Amino acid sequence: MRHFWLLPAVAGIAGAQCPYLSGEMSFTQEQDNAGDTIEVTEQPIDNTLYVNDTGSYMTTDFGTPISDQTSLKAGPRGPTLLEDFIFRQKLQRFDHERVPERVVHARGAGAYGTFKSYADWSNVTAADFLSANDKETPMFCRFSTVVGFRGSVDTARDVHGHACRFYTDEGNYDIVGINFAPFFIQDAIQFPDLVHAIKPMPNNEIPQAATAHTSAWDFFSQQSTALHSALWLMSGNGIPRSFRHMNGYGVHSFRFVAANGTSKVVRTPWKSQQGVASLVWDEAQAAAGKNSDYHRQDLYNAMPNGHYPKYELQAQIMDEADMLRFGFDLLDPTKLVPEEVVPYTPLGMMELNANPTNYFAEVEQAGFQPGHVVPGIDFTDDPLLQGRLFSYLDTQLTRHGGPNFEQIPVNRPRKPVHNNNRDGFGQQQIPTNNWAYTPNSMSNGYPMQANQTQGHGFFTAPYRYASGHLVRQTSPTFNDHWSQPAMFWNSLIPAEQQMVVNAIVFENSKVNSPHVRKNVVNQLNMVNNNLAVRVARGLGLDEPSPNPTYYTSNKTSNVGTFGKPLLSIEGLQVGFLASNSHPESIKQGQAMAAQFSAAGVDLNIVTEAYADGVNTTYALSDAIDFDALIIADGVQSLFASPALANQMNSTATSTLYPPARPFQILVDSFRYGKPVAAVGSGSVALKNAGIDSSRSGVYTGSSETTEKIAKEVLEGLYTFRFVDRFALDE
């Protein structure tokens, strides 16, 4: 121990002799290409804002060419000098690289795209982006989770943000939505309470990105408006397969206003053209541990591979007189409008086609606001919406340090901005008008005031008016908090109902207050007795007697994530389990790959080690990586069950991957409800795993029938999950 002090000195001497620390590394062509400049794809951002460092010298922020790898010192071993402006600027910029993360929706991913209108919708709205058939508008979308911090996992059970910006010819229009049709609260003044309840406990900041704790379920059981969204959260909607496989909902009622002043009340969801799909809970937890960027990676990889996510913008268009017509209030954001009551009108299609060039500059700095509207779009008196109009604007001041956040490239409109707003932190414009006030005569009154007839300015729906006494009360038309949760429950297939029960039991098993768990069961009993009884059994509580005041047999369509085939299988992943010790298995996978590629599906050949034609290895793979699985002919020795893993002819145990990894991939894929197939002797693996080849979604055949097997797997991918594999408690 007395010689320990020598170690830093010795390390320093050794380091001085290391050629890689000399600053004179030589680059091979392979090394040089490893950090290629990112190709800037066509995006609605001024190209002059992109920085290309190719062939350049290092400079300071103010343009002086420099060398920034060694501090300025008084002699080689002397103190660093305060005058070293290169050191000070480099460290200062590093110290301030981060901005405050969003309080909610901190973790996200984004993409650019294009919206194309299906028709001229000027009979219902003056919005220019909907004014002509095939009119195209650039887009930027950000998808996110809500509760977790920026470094949390993608597959946490959570509400998911679905915010989309139209860069229209008349300014930016944002639909700031989520993947649930209802929200948890009716009044924005309760939003801090909701967020404080669902965030980690303040004493220990546990749990991260989860509502499986006391304060969340205490709030849900006390604030019964939250029940509807809580059931959506416990269903597959809380753990989507990807951002590509979830819908987006604007939640609120807005108004479309035509040029003649007539207005309609609208709800405007985005419907995924891939179809809606979700993970199962064990799979979501495995993904959280194996790949915390599960959803980000899926979106980022999709577009370069030619899989462009599509979402159809739809509208439920209702008359102003319909506000109370359907048995609930259209101003209530905790309610959805069943599509059987008001069908959806398809307005246009959005296709995402380009990744951001820089995550921080574009995704992190994007600031969406429900107050970003254009002529032809107007608000309603929804009390949650009214509060969001303030909150989303206000939060940008803290995140960006001042009022000029709209000048950040991703936030800039694609038309010139003219107003009398001036100065502030981070001002990026140079105004030339010295007369920044209205009215003025010195600049001939410019910029002029725009209205509906001059300048195509924003205008408020003439129908709108306000009168009444000033009160702090909720409208009686908002008081039914249980009928729509009951309708949602009724609309789920039995397997997804079981998932809801299991999720509620799982989360409340982590609630450390007995009276909160009892309150949860009591509230669920207001929704549906069968639901409450099954949860009570799982929590070891007394089974409640029916409380039928709000019970209903009503159902609606397309609110669950199971039981309907996908609309498209493009971009899904199939694992082909092969072996280096049986080269023919790799060739077999290569032969089948073309058939999958023609359907837009990626076939990934998995072996013990990389080789020609191999996409990945068993050490890197897990059942979460694939939407379907095929076992090659001749590789059955990889799939000995754990009890037989040590038998002489088994290669199930290897230093190249964790014990029994191929076997575990097979077992988990089947357990998660995925299509599973085996070619030839690969069917032995199914037998070892206890998988009956006659089960739905299980396909077998000889090595001469691979084309048939591939076709069956492709058909199985449309089903996506075979729910007969999931146990039901009744």
Curated annotation (Swiss-Prot):
MF annotations from Gene Ontology: catalase activity; heme binding; metal ion binding
Active site annotation, chain numbering: 105
CDD domains, sorted: GATase1_catalase
Biological process according to GO: hydrogen peroxide catabolic process; response to oxidative stress
Entry EC no(s): 1.11.1.6
Keywords, in A-Z order: Heme, Hydrogen peroxide, Iron, Metal-binding, Oxidoreductase, Peroxidase
PROSITE patterns for this protein: CATALASE_1, CATALASE_2, CATALASE_3
GO CC terms in record: cytosol
SMART domains listed in its UniProt record: Catalase
Cofactor: heme
Keyword Oxidoreductase attributed: yes
Binding, heme: 392
Pfam families: Catalase (PF00199), Catalase-rel (PF06628), Catalase_C (PF18011)
Ranges where the record places region Disordered: 403-433
Catalytic activity: 2 H2O2 = O2 + 2 H2O
Family: Belongs to the catalase family.
Protein known as: Catalase R
Gene source species: Aspergillus niger
Gene it is expressed from: catR
